[in-house]
Amino acid sequence: MKLTFLGADREVTGSCTQLEAAGHRILIDCGMEQGRDVYENTELPYAPGTYEALLLTHAHIDHSGRIPYLYKNGYRGPVYTTEATRDLCGIMLEDSAHIQEQEAEWKNRKAMRSGAEMIEPDYTVEDAQNVMKQFVPCPYEAWQTLFDGPQGRIEVRFTDVGHLLGSASISLRITEAGRAPEIIVFSGDIGNRHQPLIRDPANPGHADYLVMESTYGDRSHGPKPDYLGELSGILQSTFDKGGNVVIPSFAVGRTQELLYFIRQIKAEGRIKGHGNFPVFVDSPLASKSTTIFRENFAECYDEEALALVQSGENPLQFPGLYISETKEQSVAINGDETPKVIISAAGMCDAGRIRHHLKYNLWRPECTVLFVGYQSPGTLGNALVNGAQEVKLFGEPVQVRARIAQLGGLSGHADKDGLEEWLRAFDEKPKFVFVNHGEDAVAEHWADHLKSEGYEAEAPYNGSIWIAAEGRVACAEVGNTRKILRTKTAAAVRTSAAYDRLYNMGQRLLEVIRHNQGGANKDLSKFAGQIAALCDKWDR
């Protein structure tokens, strides 16, 4: 078999690996790169239409986000994945396509003014909708034949890896003519143990060769936090002051975890004097994904959540829960003075409805803004968690008088101990481990650690090619070792953070422009003139 590493190698986004075996050519994941590149990217070696199958570990955009691009450029083969992943991709890829179209529209308006070349979005909503017809849902733990011909046989099996609803590691059993069967396992993103709702990561049992993620291969999450206790304390103290708890949250995964926690808090009567406090989920994507979480319980829920379902309870439903679908419903939330929880996207506060809720609540000392996920440098969320005293929302300065809090320990990725526990569960050591999906130093560290434990291991570069057969592995091509981004020095880190902030302010400006649609022509002309002057000053 021949492996070509095409993405998320010594990086953490853009997952994609090409496998050629038994006369067939397939892809494992086809994700979108997000954030800054570190290494030169490698394009697909072959035209999209020449691939015969695509196997998908889970729905996150850094693993699935370029699948509509493949379709747009001729791919018509099957996309094998779990049922829950298929369902989530149905909403997430369309949402991604909508963003692509909006960005292309904005860039083309600028191009028309300057005479520059027009661009097309990477893919459209129609592409995202059409590629869903290629998805083939597969159950967990069942071998299925992909190909069976004169050059050999390839079978696939999905194993729950506990990262996201429907996430899986992928085992491929490959029988090439004249050789004994061998199994290669692609770990996908390995989940953190004891996450709410979904099952803990399971091990596939056997691997001759392993492609393994290393996101947190250099750190430990520490003791499991008391999520219910911490969250209950924040709700109680805020409600007692008459304030709201505003939670910026990622629409898929984290929002559902929060609903699970709040249901339990209400069921146990932990909040005194505010027992029926309202909870608003204000994100169309979160609303759709919550419905999918509710429908995919049989294969994906852990024992505790499944027991609730079997007893007639919905783990994501409780009295006082309201889902806001329309803009009018969203606006009405802040017209009610009852202390409440508001969960809204985007998780880093640089777009979406959350910015409206921050505008109405940040200046109120009785309120709390609770962060439940990583906040990237340069984002509004990062500024708030780092103590900003004033921020701008829709062009207006807003004083930060609300309490800023963080619910630590929530992570969908296993730490180094979780990775090691998962690895040691194989029936015997894999003959070779390829380490991917980790920042450069982390992937290198995890590969070195595995070597110290007696494994044969390497962290391949983007574009590297490896040949594996009968337990032996050889590197045929090293790949792209040249870095295009160096951010190790303190000065470089500061520069990078400044650029991130500049970029995010540009995104915010777009939102402000949309917010002013329908305004007086005089005001809009003045606004446009100010932007033009700013562009003329800095376009150099």
Identify the meaning behind each predicted range.
Residues 1-55, 60, 64, 71-257, ...:
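His/Asp/Glu-rich metal-coordinating catalytic cores
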Residues 49-51, 73-76, 237-246, 334-339, ...:
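Short, surface-exposed connector motifs at secondary-structure boundaries
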Residues 392-423:
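Generic long, charged, amphipathic alpha-helical segments
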Residues 234-380, 392, 427, 442-444, ...:
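Hard-cation-handling environments
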Residues 237, 463-526:
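Charged, amphipathic alpha-helical linkers/stalks
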Residues 196-211, 297-305, 375-401:
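Short, compositionally biased "basic patch" segments
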Residues 364, 438-482:
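C-terminal, active-site-flanking charged/polar segments
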